[in-house]
């Protein structure tokens, strides 16, 4: 399934360039102009690569085995990040105008609601973790489509929350199981939930456009609030009592890598939430914070 969906995504990109003519592949991501047909197919290809519901099948675990941290980080988060940035470029080329249609936003909110329900009702940790990350990516797509500055800049904070917050949430869960130390998993979960002083909070002004855009967007906002509430409720399961492995049962090199990963993810996550302008300058982007 993963290979089939990956091939379909690439095929949509190739087909999407046909209406753009001979100059289609030469379009610049920042200043190019593409026809609606190309933008639509690029959005589909982005959704497949980002694993947004219902194009998430290639991300689902094949077994009910225990969580493999490396597999979730490399096989899930890395390709999804590529898909989110492809979404950003597509939005900048004009795809955001297609996304702002009330029907499209309603579909995005409904898919986010379905993902949140799946995360809440997941019976095992592996599916639970997978659907929480899929839901977080869905929030990033919705925020990017509504951003005041469509493009990679508009998706920067939601994508940062997914990458750093989601990564710390995964690593922190293993830290908690090893030592009973809750701070890393808690910080990661709070970043995914979008609380103040985290990059996820800086993406909230984009989502608030659903309230200021007119009454036609209010049902979409209601769907989003319900979906986000369920997703946050699912994140609260992060504080349920884990199966303690015990640090003495784990190799010393593994525990050292967990500690290093927690610091490597937690430090930039804290800096990005507290010093957003410094972070956007460091990333080489501008106008990422909503006015």
What are these regions (language model features)?
Residues 1-37, 48, 118-179:
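Alpha-helical multi-pass transmembrane bundles of energy-transducing inner-membrane proteins
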Residues 3-19, 70-86, 132-146, 183-194, ...:
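Small-residue-rich segments of transmembrane alpha-helices in multi-pass membrane proteins
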Residues 7, 11, 40-103, 127-130:
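Short helix-boundary/re-entrant hairpin motifs in multi-pass inner-membrane proteins
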Residues 21, 159-175, 182, 218-262, ...:
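Predominantly late transmembrane helices and immediately cytosolic-facing juxtamembrane segments
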Residues 32-48, 93-111, 151-164, 221-227:
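Structural signature of hydrophobic alpha-helical transmembrane segments
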Residues 140-147, 204-221:
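Interfacial segments of multi-pass membrane proteins
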Residues 206-211, 275-291:
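Membrane-interfacial helical/loop segments at transmembrane boundaries in membrane proteins
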């Amino acid at each position: 399934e993963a290979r089939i969906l990956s091939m379909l995504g690439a095929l949509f990109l190739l087909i999407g360039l046909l209406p753009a003519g001979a100059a289609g592949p030469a379009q610049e991501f920042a200043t190019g102009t593409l026809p609606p047909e190309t933008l639509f197919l690029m959005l589909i290809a982005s959704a497949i690569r980002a694993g947004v519901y219902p194009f998430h099948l290639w991300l689902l675990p094949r077994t009910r085995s225990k969580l493999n941290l490396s597999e979730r980080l490399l096989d899930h988060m890395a390709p999804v990040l590529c898909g989110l940035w492809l979404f950003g470029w597509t939005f900048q080329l004009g795809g955001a105008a297609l996304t702002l249609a009330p029907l499209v936003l309603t579909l995005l909110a409904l898919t986010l609601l379905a993902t949140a329900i799946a995360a809440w009702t997941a019976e095992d940790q592996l599916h639970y973790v997978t659907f929480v990350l899929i839901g977080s990516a869905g929030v990033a797509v919705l925020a990017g489509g509504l951003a005041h500055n469509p493009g990679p800049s508009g998706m920067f904070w939601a994508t940062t929350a997914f990458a750093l917050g989601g990564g710390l949430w995964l690593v922190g869960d293993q830290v908690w199981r090893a030592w009973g130390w809750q701070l890393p998993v808690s910080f990661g979960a709070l970043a995914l939930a979008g609380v103040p002083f985290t990059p996820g909070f800086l993406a909230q002004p984009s989502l608030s456009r659903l309230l200021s855009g007119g009454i036609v967007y209010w049902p979409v906002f209601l769907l989003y609030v319900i979906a986000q509430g369920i997703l946050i409720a699912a994140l609260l399961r992060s504080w349920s009592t884990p199966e303690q492995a015990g640090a003495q049962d784990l190799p010393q090199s593994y525990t050292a890598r967990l500690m290093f990963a927690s610091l490597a993810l937690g430090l930039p996550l804290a800096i990005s939430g507290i010093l957003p302008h410094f972070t956007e300058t460091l990333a080489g982007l501008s106008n990422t914070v909503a006015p």
